[in-house]
Amino acid sequence: MRILDVVETTKPISSPIRNAYIDFSKMTSSLVAVVTDVVRDGRRVVGYGFNSNGRYGQGGLIRERFRDRILEAEPASLLNDEGSNLDPHRIWAKMMSNEKPGGHGERSVAVGTLDMAIWDAAAKIGGKPLFRLLAEMKGKEANPRVFVYAAGGYYYPGKDNSALQAEMRGYLNRGYNVVKMKIGGASIGEDRGRIEAVLKEIGSDAKLAVDANGRFDLETGIAYAKMLREYPLFWYEEIGDPLDYALQAAIAEFYPGPMATGENLFSHQDARNLLRYGGMRPDRDWLQFDCALSYGLVEYLRTLDVLAQHG
């Protein structure tokens, strides 16, 4: 059993939507295929992965560093002890060989994209969905249900509040009971109007979360907190720079409702620092680490261990 090739292509997202920081018409994404010599049901097993939007495609790093480390490794060193499947943890260690710790940057996205494709291949070789493979690795019963919500409400050229309401109604019609919209890309007064329009539309059928995408400084974050606490929101997300733990902790003094962050923290060390210094409240706040952006599922499992250590 071996990995025959690792293929990456970078494609534009090509959408005119934007949040408080990002114009997605300029954004790209990496699509990765990990090609194995394994055949299942008459088809070659290929694992696929892609990076989340909000970070650019990582073709350069993948081709210049990480792809060759996988392909140049002794094939047996990338397998589990039984030789019956790929071992994502061992492959991850090969990818990260000769890399200094810290300073994660775009490297975490390149490795994460590859790692997700490797796990996809491992699940296909194992003949089961990834969630079941993971549960078995932990000696647990797989839960086929998971909380999901509809993330939308982007700023869009010519999009007025009626269009925003129609978008949110569409999510409800598809069965979602939590929807999310962007804030911070307009004035606080305009954002208030957008929030009120959505709340009027969804009524008691759903809950609304809002996401600032890390746009606010402390003063603006507090101003929004004072405005947002007037409404029954599901959460107030990513208020300031993700590494400004003191800002995150300070906002809790002004916002009693649930807050959410973690999407742009890329390691278990960053997660630990958020828990140590970010003032996160275990009874109400949400942690949102993104596997594909943060070195993949291998590192995400380490992050879960950190969370368990901190209760």
Tell where the protein language model's regions lie, with residue ranges:
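N-terminal amphipathic alpha-helix/helix-capping segment at the start of soluble metabolic enzymes
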Residues: 1-8, 19-23, 93-102, 124, ...
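Structured beta-strand/loop patches that form or line metal/cofactor-binding pockets in enzymes
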Residues: 1-59
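Metal- or metallocofactor-binding catalytic centers and their adjacent structured scaffolds
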Residues: 39-125
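Active-site mouth loops of central-metabolism enzymes
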Residues: 104, 145-165, 183, 212-217, ...
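N-terminal small/glycine-rich loop or linker at the start of catalytic domains
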Residues: 131-159, 194, 201-203, 256
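Catalytic domains of carbohydrate-active enzymes, especially glycoside hydrolases
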Residues: 167-182
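Catalytic core of soluble alpha/beta enzymes
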Residues: 185-311
